[in-house]
C-alpha cells in the first residue's frame, strides 16, 4: 500500500472495535497489516469493511503450532496490537515479556476499556460504560432528559483507537533513539478523559457547570444547537462569534436590535423560541441554500444516505463506493506520500506466505 507508513509491519490479534479500527488506519496510511484470526472466525470477513487493507491469516493461539507461528510473525514485526482483557495474552504465551524475547524492538500496543491496572481492569464494559465514569456521558443530552449515548464514537474511537495510534507512533519515534520497543497501555477511560480536557479547564474557571444542557457547547446556548425546519429535517447552528452570529441573523431576516442579547443567559429561552420559529418557516434545503456561501456557521444535518450527494464531500472524495455501499477514504491527506484507495477485506492466506514475504 502507498502512504507515509509504507514498510511498517503490524501484527493485529483479532478483536473488535478500537483495535481493528487502529489497525485499519495504519493500513490506510500504508502499513503492512497482518491480522491473526481464529480459524473459526473467518466467516463474514468480507462483510466487515473495517478489515480493509489487511492480509488475514488464521492460527489457533491455544495450540503449540499456532503459538509458534504467531511468535515467528511477531519476531519480524514493528508493532503488535491486542485488545484482550489484561492477562489473556500472557496466558497464551504472547505477553510483552515473551514477545520481547523474540523481538526487543516491538511496540506492544494494548487496547482496553479500563486499562491494564485498577479495580475495574478485569471488568466487562463498553463505550457507554467507560465514558460514564469520567463525566462525559453526564454532560451529553438535554437538561430535562437522561444522558444520551454519543454513538460509540467518544470511548471506542475518539478515546480508544485514536490514542492507541498516538501511543504507537510516539513509541516508534522514541525507538529511533533508544533502539528498544515498549508497551503502550491505551485505555478508553483515559483517552476519552483527555478529549474532554477543555471542559475541565472551563469548569475550573467557572465557565462550565455540571448542569447538562445549560452550557455554551452542549446545546444550552441557542446559537449552538440544532433546529427543526418546516419539512421535519434539521440544521446545525454554531454561530458563536459575534460576526458569525450576525451573519446568521441576516440570513434569517432577523434584526439583532429586536432580539435579546446573544449572551444574556437569562433570556436564552426567549432567544431560542425566536430562532425556533424562524428556522421552522422554511424547509432544510432552503436554509442550506441561504447559508451555503456565508460565514453564518449554519449547515444542513445530513443522514448517512444523503452524505455522498453533498458537493463538498464529492469534491474532496471523502467517500468511495465499494461493494454496493459507501466507505470513508483514508485521512489525513499527505502532499508527497498520498494513500491509495483502500483494498477490500481479503480472503485468508497461509501464514507461511507472510513469513516468506517478510523474510525478503
Curated annotation (Swiss-Prot):
Changing residue 111 to P: 5.2% of wild-type activity. It comes from Mycobacterium tuberculosis (strain ATCC 25618 / H37Rv). Keywords: Isomerase, Lipid metabolism. Homodimer. The gene is mcr. Gene3D superfamilies: 3.30.60.110, Crotonobetainyl-coa:carnitine coa-transferase, domain 1, formyl-coa transferase, domain 3. It catalyses: a (2S)-2-methylacyl-CoA = a (2R)-2-methylacyl-CoA; (2S)-2-methyltetradecanoyl-CoA = (2R)-2-methyltetradecanoyl-CoA; (2R)-pristanoyl-CoA = (2S)-pristanoyl-CoA; (25S)-3-oxocholest-4-en-26-oyl-CoA = (25R)-3-oxocholest-4-en-26-oyl-CoA. Inactivated by N,N-dialkylcarbamoyl-CoA substrate-product analogs. This is Alpha-methylacyl-CoA racemase. The keyword Isomerase applies. Changing residue 190 to A: 3.3% of wild-type activity. Development of gem-disubstituted substrate-product analogs as inhibitors of racemases and epimerases is elaborated using alpha-methylacyl-CoA racemase from Mycobacterium tuberculosis as a model enzyme. These non-physiologic substrates could be used as a therapeutic agent to inhibit human AMACR, which is overexpressed in prostate cancer. It is an enzyme of class 5 (isomerase). The active site is at residues 126, 156. One of its GO terms (molecular function) is protein homodimerization activity. Belongs to the CoA-transferase III family. SUPFAM superfamilies: CoA-transferase family III (CaiB/BaiF).
Amino acid at each position: 500500500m502507498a502512504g507515509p507508513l509504507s514498510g511498517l509491519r503490524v501484527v493485529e490479534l483479532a478483536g473488535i472495535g478500537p483495535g481493528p479500527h487502529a489497525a485499519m488506519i495504519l493500513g490506510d496510511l500504508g502499513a503492512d497489516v497482518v491480522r491473526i484470526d481464529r480459524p473459526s472466525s473467518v466467516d463474514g470477513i468480507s462483510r466487515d469493511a473495517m478489515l480493509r487493507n489487511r492480509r488475514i491469516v488464521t492460527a489457533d493461539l491455544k495450540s503449540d503450532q499456532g503459538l509458534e507461528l504467531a511468535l515467528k510473525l511477531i519476531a519480524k514485526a514493528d508493532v503488535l496490537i491486542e485488545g484482550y482483557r489484561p492477562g489473556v495474552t500472557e496466558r497464551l504465551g504472547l505477553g510483552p515479556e515473551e514477545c520481547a524475547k523474540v523481538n526487543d524492538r516491538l511496540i506492544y500496543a494494548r487496547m482496553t476499556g479500563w486499562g491494564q491496572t485498577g479495580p475495574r481492569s478485569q471488568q466487562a464494559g463498553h463505550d457507554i460504560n467507560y465514558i460514564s465514569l469520567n463525566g462525559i456521558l453526564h454532560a451529553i443530552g438535554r437538561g430535562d432528559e437522561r444522558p444520551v449515548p454519543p454513538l460509540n464514537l467518544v470511548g471506542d474511537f475518539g478515546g480508544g483507537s485514536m490514542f492507541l495510534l498516538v501511543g504507537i507512533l510516539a513509541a516508534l519515534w522514541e525507538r529511533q533513539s533508544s533502539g528498544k520497543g515498549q508497551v503502550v497501555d491505551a485505555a478508553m477511560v483515559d483517552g476519552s478523559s483527555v478529549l474532554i480536557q477543555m471542559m475541565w479547564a472551563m469548569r475550573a474557571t467557572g465557565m462550565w457547570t455540571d448542569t447538562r444542557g445549560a452550557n455554551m457547547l452542549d446545546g444550552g446556548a441557542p446559537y449552538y444547537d440544532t433546529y427543526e425546519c418546516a419539512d421535519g429535517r434539521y440544521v446545525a447552528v454554531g454561530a458563536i462569534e459575534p460576526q458569525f452570529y450576525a451573519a446568521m441573523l441576516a440570513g434569517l431576516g432577523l434584526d439583532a436590535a429586536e432580539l435579546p442579547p446573544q449572551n444574556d443567559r437569562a433570556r436564552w429561552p426567549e432567544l431560542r423560541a425566536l430562532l425556533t420559529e424562524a428556522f421552522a418557516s422554511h424547509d432544510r434545503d432552503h436554509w442550506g441554500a441561504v447559508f451555503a456561501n456565508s460565514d453564518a456557521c449554519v449547515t444542513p444535518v445530513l443522514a448517512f444516505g444523503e452524505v455522498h450527494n453533498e458537493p463538498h464531500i464529492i469534491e474532496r472524495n471523502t467517500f468511495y463506493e465499494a461493494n454496493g455501499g459507501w466507505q470513508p477514504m483514508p485521512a489525513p491527506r499527505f502532499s508527497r506520500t498520498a494513500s491509495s484507495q483502500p483494498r477490500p477485506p481479503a480472503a485468508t492466506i497461509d501464514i507461511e506466505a507472510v513469513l516468506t514475504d517478510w523474510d525478503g
